[in-house]
Structure formats: structure tokens, C-alpha cells
Amino acid sequence: VLIGDPITTCLSPSVYDIICNLGFQLRENCDINSIVTQNGEVCWKTITDCVSYTESDQGLDYWGSVRLLGPVCEAVHSHFLSLTKGQFEIRYAPWFQWTSFPELFPEIFDALESLQSPAISLSLMKLTSCLERALGDVFLLIGKECPFLLRDLLASEELAQVFGQSVMNVLKVFVGSPCGLNLRNVLWHGFASPEEVPPKYCSMMMLLTAGLGQLLKSYLQKTKLTLAHRSFITPTNLEDLIVFPDVTYEVLSVLEEAMTKSAFILKIMLPYWEVALVKFKSHRFADCAILLLTQLETGLRNVFATLNRCPQRLLTAEILAKHLNDGKINQLPLFLGEPAMEFLWDFLNHQEGPRIRDHLSHGEINLHEFSKETTNQLLAFSVVLLLRFVDEGLLSVFKEKASVELLISLAEGYSSRCHPVFQLKKQVLSCEESIRVWALLPFPKELTWEAVRLEDNSETNACHSLITKMTDELYHHMPEDHCVLKDLDHLPTETWPQLLHELCSTPVRTLFCPRIVLEVLVVLRSIGKQCHRVSGQVTIASELRHRQWVERTLRSRQRQNYLRMWSSIRLLSPVLSLILFLITLELVNVHAVCGKNAHEYQQYLKFVKSILQYTENLVAYTSYEKNKWNETINLTHTVLLKIWTFSEKKQMLIHLAKKSTSKVLMKT
């Protein structure tokens, strides 16, 4: 797929020029003492005077600014290289304390001293993410909602109020605009090779960070405000994403060889992969993940541009989208296959996924606490991906290793763990397990007869009759190759767990779900959430009343309420199980909603929202504050009639989906 002339840069000519050439055009020497004092205090005027503006003074002249700032950056870089680490820490360490990660900066100093290009690029990535997080904290001294994008943050009036507009303009030149050096985006999106990032820009960004700390100190003293750091976030649903085993030394040796043989890796980017491996072996898991994420994007962008025959898009492509800008189908998902695309979407894009790249690049994760398990998953996936781009002979040799064969097998069987479909399945099974606990709730034997007598009323009996009819109806819509009871006149309660587990094991297409499907999933998930809340409230209320009964602290009214509650529970258990069954069947057939016209869709949405309304009312009525157990019976009867009426119209998704004639009898 990737046979062609070697790629020498992933930067456009103009971006290459501004980063690699423009800041070196002026050869004049700049006196370091005019930039920073012996005590490490930044002389901002020298720096801000280098920023150029357009003739109308309405905007920044980015090219002119980069050109003038070049000698300043050179002087700063030489200055840092002339210091010992001890001197650096004495002069500058206090001015990094305003960031939430001050210990990063001595590491960056070490990277600059090492003169190793990949380490300097990695340092610059970590510096920009740390700076963005710290600037967000400063923004919140005045503002209320911190902008998500760094460029919007740098353009905010709040930061200009703290640091001054001329200082913010300096930052815009380095990291705040695609018209400037744009160092953050160029590195975090994997465009710049190690040799294309001048180390002097890393040195300059470090000095600017120290200078911002000095300006902030003055501002805080003047305003009597206190800077508070937001807590780091913990990425969500990571436990669901652990599908690959720990990477072994055997797998690492395969990766080391594959890196030099796989067409997926651009030769100019190979040093990043080599450093990523070193970082993994030395337990620097966040560093490894940062490098892997950026280089996976680089490699995938190259495959994207090749498959879609748009080499110019190597510079800009949005690689995970379904369509290209011209409306044509993106060939990358077809080539990689759904499992690989699902993995990428889970880790990078899904709102309920860990969104590792986003959180790392915005400085929201504590790098020291970044988990080995997460990096393991990225590394294992990278191995499988690289092997897609080696020749058949070498692939056969690698596949002889059991550990490699296992990784490939697991990757090929991957399905989304962060898509709303998976989350709804997880929710249903958790709720079913919660409802199952009701059968174990204690109830005084001496009250059993009274509770049974309360159940014997026409409305409760009508509810049970409707539940039986609907269970029979729904059972006929089990998907192909799933079980059907021999005797549909009676559904034993012990079959519900097996039934729901089987349904939740049914594959549902998740990649590039249409908006209409996602809208339905939102409502179905809301129903599941409310069912779970009801289940939890019932358990707590029952345990409380039983404890009061045992301790003989139940008053007469509370005793009657306890009986009504128990009577209600015996109805709510099959009702909630039925609703879980219904929403899971609808989930399995959710793509059938695309076959509805606008009117039919609105009617369907109205129907599922009526079930949601019922579950929300149940939450209210079963709460400790309201305790309206009798009213739940009338609510339940009403919603069961609605469900049955709508089912009779054959407008549920189970009615629209194609019926399979293949059925398997379940042993009863």
C-alpha cells in the first residue's frame, strides 16, 4: 500500500519554512543580559519589542515576529546550555511553581543538555500541555469557564488582564496560531520529525514560562488573589479497554524488528518510535504513550493519504472520519477494518472513552500516575498495526510466536467498549443484577399473608396479565441463533439473567452510527439509568424498613407503608425486567430506526420517551422523601397499556427488523 518515494517531511512548505528557516535568517548576536537578569528575572520588553504587527496594527505579523525573535531564542538557548543543572534550578525553579507540574522543567533542562532531538520534541510537547493547564488555572482567577482550545485561551481578555496583551502576543507567535510557529499542534499531531524542531524554541518556551510565573506573582500580590490548581482527571472506562495482555519481552523484540521493516513508520519518524520503546522499558509510561499516540496519527495519516489518493492531505487529514471533505467515502476504515477503527475511536474520540490524546495534550493527566495498563494497550495495538505493513514472509515468521498470534487474534476480535451501544449493554446487565438482589431482601414471615392480600386487586392482576402477554410477544422477536423457551405460557424468573446476557452478547454495529440511531440510544440509556436508580432505592428502603421492624421502631403508618412497599416490589420486579428486556431488544435492532420516515420516527421517539417518563416517575415515587408505593401500581398499569398498544401497531424496532427463521431451543 505504501510503496513510493520516501517522505522527507510532513510539513507543508510554508510551515517548514517558518519553523526551520525563518528564525535563523537574522545572524545578529543578542545580549542575554537584555533578556534575563543574573537572578533569572525575564526582561519582557526586549521580547515584546520583537513582535511585529501588520500595517493597520489590527493583527500580528507572525512571519516578521518569528524572524525578529530568532536571535533572542538563540541567546536564550545558549544561556541555558551554559548553566549547570544546579545553577538552572537556583535561578529558575521558583518561577515554575505556578504550574501544576514544576518538576517537569529540570527534566526539560536535561533533554536540552542531551542534544537528542526526539527528547527535545517530547519535552516541548509536555511543556505546552503543562503550560496550557497552568494558564487555564490563571484564567479561572477571573473567568468562569475555561476555553477548551489553547488558541482561544491565549486570545482571552482574562489572560491579557493578568499578563498584559503584549505578552500574550508573544505566546501566540509560538503556540497560539496556525499562522505562527504553532509548536503545540505541529508536535502533538505528529507533523514534525525530530530534526525539524529547533531546540532553541524549547529553551525559549521554558524561559517564557518562568517569565509568566514572575508576572503572575506580581498580579497575585496586587490583587490579593490565590491561584488554585484544578485536580488532574482520571480517564474514564479504562478498565473496559484492557483487552491485550501485558507486553512481554518477546513482543518488544518483535516490535523492535518490525519498526525497521514496517512501511507504516516513516523513516524520518523512526527515532520517536525508538525513544517510545526506551521510555516503556524504563517505566516512563506517559512519555511512551505520548510518542505512540502522535506517531500512530502520523502513520495513519500517511495510509489515509495513500488510500484516498490525496497526497496533499498528508499535511492536514482528519483520518477517522467516514467521509472526505468532497463527500467521498474514506477508504481508511475499509482498509483497517472495523475492529482497528473501533479501537482508535475508543481511545481517542468517544466522549465516554478515556480520550487519552486530548487529556494528555491539554495537561489534564498526572504524567507520574499514568497507568502501565493503558500504555500496554497502545503498544500492543501498535505491534499489530505495524505487522499489517511488513512483507508476508516476515509476517509468517512473527506469527509463529504465540504471543504475537494472540495479539493479532485479540485485535481482530475487538469491538467498541466506549460506544453508547456497549455502555447500554453494560448498564442493562448491571441493573438486572441489582434487581436480582430483591429476591434476597428479608421480609417478616408474620406479615407475608397481609402483603399477599394487598396484591390481590384488579389493577395488580391486570398488570401481571399484561406482563405475561408482552413477554410472550417480545420473546418471538429474539434475534437469530438465540434461545426461545419451549413453553411461552410461563417465563420462569430465573431465565431473565440468561436471556439478557444472550441479548447483550449480540453484535450491534457501532462504527459511524447515524445521528438518528444515537438519539434513540440516548433515550434507551436514560431509561436504563432510571431503572437502576429505582432498583437501588427499593433495596435501601426495604433494608431500612426491615431493620426498623426487627428493632420494633415501626409506627403503625410505617407498618402499612412497609406492606404496600413489599406488595409493590413484587410487581415492580417483573415490570423492570420486562422494560430491560424491551430496551435490549430495541438496542439489538436499533439500526432499523433508519427505515422510519420523519412522522414514524417522531411517534417512536414519543413512545420510548413515555417509558422514560414512567421510570422517572418511579424514581420519584420510590424515593425516601415520597414513599408513594400504592401510586406505582397505577403508574405501572398505565405504561403497560401504552407499551401494549404501541406494540399492536407493529411500530417498534423489533417489528421493523428482519426476522430470522433460525431459532435454538433453550433447555428448561
Swiss-Prot record:
The keyword Endoplasmic reticulum applies. Its main location: endoplasmic reticulum. It is a multi-pass membrane protein. The chain crosses the membrane at residues 378-398, 575-595. One of its GO terms (cellular component) is endoplasmic reticulum membrane. The keyword S-adenosyl-L-methionine does not apply. Keywords: Developmental protein, Endoplasmic reticulum, Membrane, Transmembrane, Transmembrane helix. It is found in: Endoplasmic reticulum membrane. Pfam families: DUF4209 (PF13910). May play a role in neuronal migration during embryonic development. This is Endoplasmic reticulum membrane-associated RNA degradation protein.
